[in-house]
Amino acid sequence: VLAAGTSSRMGSNKLLADIGGKPMVRHTVAALQRASIDQIVVVTGRDSDHVIAALQGLPVICVHNPEFAHGLSTSLRRGLEVVPEDSDAVLVCLGDMPLVDEAVASRLIAAFSPAEHRSICVPVHQGMRGNPVLWAARHFAEMAAATGDVGARRLFETNSSAIVEVPLDDAVLFDVDVEADLDRLARLRPPR
């Protein structure tokens, strides 16, 4: 779970925003826990101590990314550093997507089959790609070499034959960037 952003458009740390009585990042992590993800790694940055406190009691490994201000790729790299070597895959989730539930993770995992050239599982809604994305271990080195804040775009371009798009609901497109997104979230549907 990438939870190290600067929240520059929001001002305050959006990951700590109260959503139904819980911090936003806790919703994301709890959904992964319900999906029976083997190990959940949370990469922190800004307000690291507060993010860790928001996750207290959940079985997660928290690692701090001191370079979080240099882009998402630094957090991705930091998270990959602690993934066990025998892992088959990682599900890269963004901490600011509180509507992504365990069904999303479960559907992506069900679609995963590197032997059948489905080593990158991407959720889509109405033709638009979203998050989280499931990546096979064979992509870890390339992921760790990414730079800046471009996310997966370049990796998608160089690995297009390995991608399977998994149709899902609009939760995979909704993230919180500004205060108005919190208002919109309350109108859409409460996260679990």
Where do the PLM segments sit?
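Short, well-ordered coil↔helix boundary/capping segments
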Residues: 134-137, 146
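A general boundary/transition motif marking the beginning of the first structured unit of a protein
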Residues: 39, 143-144
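Nucleotide and nucleotide-moiety/phosphate-recognizing core
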Residues: 2-129, 137, 161-167
